[in-house]
Amino acid sequence: MITPVRPKRKKKPPLSFVATCGAGLEQLVAGEIEAQGGRNSAVNPGAVSWEGNLESGYRMCLWSRFASRVLLQITGFDAPDADTLYRQAGKIDWDEHLACDTPFAVFSTVTDSPISHSKYAALRIKDAIADQFRSRSGRRPSVDTSRPGMRISLHLQGSRATLAVDLSGDSLHRRGYRRAAVEAPLKETLAAAIVYLSGLRRSFPPDRVVLDPMCGGGTLLIEAAMILGDSAPGLQRKSFGFLFWNRHDERLWEKLVNEAVRREEDGHRQPWPRIIGYDADPHAVTAARENIAAAGLDDKITVGQRQLAALERPADEGLLVVNPPYGERLADREEIKYLYRFLDRQLGRELAGWRIGFFSSNPDLAGGFSLNWSDSYKLFNGPIRCRLHCGTIARTTEHAPGLPSLHEPETGGEGADFAARLQANCRRLFPWAEREDISCFRLYGSDLPGYDLALDLYERWILATGHAAAAGGDPRAADHRFNVALRAVREILAIPPGRIFLRKAGGGKKKGKAGPKPSRTKIFEVDEQRCRFLVNLTDDRGTGLPLARRSLRLLIGRSAEGRTFLNLNGGTGTATVHALVNGALATTTVDPAAGQLHLARSNFFLNGFGGPQHRTIQEDSLKWLAGCRSRFGLILVNAPCCPDGRDSAAPSRFRLEHEQLLRAAMKVLTREGLLLLAVDDPCFTPAPSLAADFILEDISSRLTAPDFAGQPNRSPCFAFRHRPLEPEG
């Protein structure tokens, strides 16, 4: 008996696919293709091609975390001109791919092609498809470029054309969970790459924590949870391009979806690490919660409103992923660098030993970190070139700024009386400063006749302010005594000349033999109890941290907890920082000078505070109060002094303006609130009518610190409260 020989089935030739992706994600996509059964992958900029069966294409649509689109190539041909493009496209049997009642669109990319206009190339392909349908059935399919059912992709590379069906439809970064948007959101595909490259895998131990302290809309957290839970990114999508494709295999797709559902259910039954997110912006927190709920992960991810200043260690080990703000404008970047500085310090204090993934578009800012990055990846956030830095957070040891060591001055000789007084002041003040955690204070304030200058210590630096010679005095003799005093400073405190800055009271540069060139701007960071400030020791208008107001700032800190704080003519916001650090619920700082508010925001960031509840407003305080509808439990009014001049009516006019400002401020003070008035005018007294209408107290003597004891009070302070309401009847 002869057994018939059955002819061998011809193997179907493999299909050709291309997955497009953001720059820098190609190797991640290639790894996914291999995991989903693809073969012979080839990596190109922004795309990875491979061969495989239809299942590999479907799996990439369902499971790819990093790809943007999955294209199934139909054909390729030479197209030296648009007419050839039309003819070759007309040879394809479009009935195999597209139903006449399915809206479609053609999208094209062109690289070094003789057909240089991408939209014209797409139009010729569209015409070829529509003309073929019309010639066969008398009907033309509709074109919808905004929401097409089927997307046809044309890629022209030189004179070579490639046509493909877009199996993904909408870009794969659209997972389906984003319900609420925030400013500058990350694409989901990029967010997934950030957490994956930072070291997150399904095997992440459940006793650890994934933390994003600036979570925005929660995209990094959600993508992390989807990795941990073995969730297919495409499982929540409502539509794919292949659902409108005539060769779609419904049974295959259902099988893959059912498998993905089972895997996700199994993943959610496993022990999970805690996933935590914070943001200073309450609107961002609301958006994150909406997105997390839409992703079905509200039982896995916890988010809350919290300032970066409150960042603390939630577990012994964990992974921190963070995408700080970039600062598109130069002024914004200048402010945000201080947020980076705070983050660097806080991470070293709180999260030593944790892994970190730090995503930034500004290499200068990230380069200022004290961390040693173990890996760095070039990525793009849209058109913005970025880097993801990864590593392990090292513990940073912060040393409190020590006080200068005291040395014996030369005995006898010129300036001996000044040297003795300076040394006595230091011995009296240094123990007090250490006890009160104060590193910036006055060392000398015109204590002795003939030495009319002020010496202020700002941690490692000295600011020497010389006063003009008295009427009839010899300016050259005054300058000589100024230099004698500087010599004593160098001897007693061992301060090198480069750390001594000179200033002339009332503006202008003080001549002296010590100190750097005053034309160079020098910004330093200094501490004041638990606050950190920027000081400018080369600006004749002020340092940004007036030492005479220190006690007032500390009083504001003691009074701020649980209150809303308003700082009028708030300058560099130093009083606001004390309110923030000590628990103010919300703050508003008003000042007419943009430069002052720029420094105020920098000070906020330097202390880890930001968000819309801490506002800075550039406007005249009285004008702003006229339209204010908010109420504040604590208000500081910084009133300017009366300008020098021959106008005899100026003092009374200034007192009237102060009264108008105070009455307007009292209107926005809560019934139980406290208003503090500080005036840079030693002769100022409030109008009698204010004392009649409000409870008024002169608190100047209570706010005189040891370093200003015995000196004239040049900045009197007053406290105002509302009088109790009269009982009705």
Predicted features, each with a name:
Residues 2, 8-38, 42-43, 47-67, ...:
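S-adenosyl-L-methionine
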Residues 23, 64-72, 380-387, 392-481:
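Polybasic, low-complexity RNA-engagement segments
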Residues 44-107, 460:
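Conserved AdoMet
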Residues 88-180, 440-456, 463, 478-546, ...:
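Non-catalytic substrate-recognition/targeting regions of SAM-dependent transferases
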Residues 186-312, 335, 552-611, 618-621:
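Conserved S-adenosyl-L-methionine
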Residues 227, 295, 346-350, 664-671, ...:
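Conserved helix-to-beta-strand junction in the class I
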Residues 307-402, 673-729:
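C-terminal catalytic and target-recognition region of SAM-dependent MTase-like enzymes
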Residues 311-319, 626-636:
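A short acidic, Gly/Pro-enriched loop at the edge of an enzyme's catalytic core
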